[in-house]
Every structure is written in C-alpha cells, then in structure tokens.
Amino acid sequence: MDGDTLSGFHYELIEAFARDHSLQVAITPEMSFNERLEGLANGRFDVIAYGILATSELKDSLLLTSPIVLNRQVLVQRKTDSPDDSLFIKSQLDLAGKTLNVVEGSPSILRIRNLGNEIGDTIYIKEVEKYGSEQLIALVAHGDIDYAVCEESIARAAADSLPQIDINTAISFTQFYSWGVSKQSPVLLDSLNTWLERFKKGKEYRKIYKRYY
C-alpha cells in the first residue's frame, strides 16, 4: 500500500497477468501470512501474489509457481552515531537475546530459528498480526520497536523515505521467491507458470523489475 493506493512489484505483475488473460482482478491487502494461507484454502483467494520463499513447511499447504524474483530477508534497525550503541546490530552474532518483529506467519520465522541454532543462542521472535512489513519498518524508524525482519526489496523502497533506518544486516541468503495457489488449483498454477515464463523474457517485466529492485 502507498497511502490509499495499491502499488508494488507483485501488484503490477498480477495486473499484467489479468490484463493478458482478459480477467478482472480483485486485490485484497492481507497483512497476516497465516490469513493468506487460510484464504487460499477456503477459496476466498485464488492467488497469493506476494513473494513466498519455498520451505518444506509451506509445500504441504499450497502450490508454488516457478520462481518470480530473487530476494533475501534483512534486519531493519535504526542507524546510530555511536560505535558503542548496544542496540545496534553489527553482525548476526549480535542478534543473541534480541527480539525481532515479523509479520504473523512469515516464512522468515523458520530462518530466524535456524539462525539462532547457527549462532548457538536464542533469538526471540514476536509475530505481529495487524501490521505488514511496511508498517513494521515505520515502527522501527520512529522508535516504537527496535528490530524488524522483512524482504530486502521492501526495506530498500522504505529506506528512500526513512533515511534513519539501516538495512545492511542480512538474515538469509539471496533466494528465489514465488507466488502461491491452492493445492486444488493445478490448472491455475500451469496458467501462471506458462505466462511467467513468457512475460519474464519481455521488456515490460524488465521495466517493472527495475522500478522496485
């Protein structure tokens, strides 16, 4: 969301898909990832047009399209002028004992848990139900929370208007992200994959991609 206007990489992509198939698309902004999965399962949604990282947990819940974009999860925190600021995270090891805010049901939760195992210490996770990534970033910027984890592309877009945030600490490696459809919709999956294979080779996709990445 940009103010009261829907926008973004995935929005422009699903609009292009609908246009090319002479379909009317109804967009429902849903912050909670769990609610997205539930909406897909009960038929309220046809597609989760949002970057979904393929994990073994999710593969039991939905069908994933062919990869759409490369992205990674990053830590969002406030910049500091003090080298001794104990709140400022300089490396993943500094995350020990810290609490990271994420969108409820976010696939990044599994990665954060694994990261805790890698550094040999506990990283606490707070799932936020009513806010999306953009809102969590704003809460960090304004000092309401100290840390959030979200996709790098979203964080970079936000950093343009929130210069006080630091997004340089990676939480995950760069990985492919896909869209999701119901396990009962293999025909829709095939249609999306066929279209994506063709569309990603064209100028329009490159133009949209450059706008957000």
Whereabouts are the PLM-identified features?
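A ligand-binding cleft/hinge motif common to bilobed small-molecule-binding domains
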Residues: N34, E38-A41, Y50-S61, R111-E118, ...
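Short beta-strand->loop
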Residues: D2-L6, G97-G105
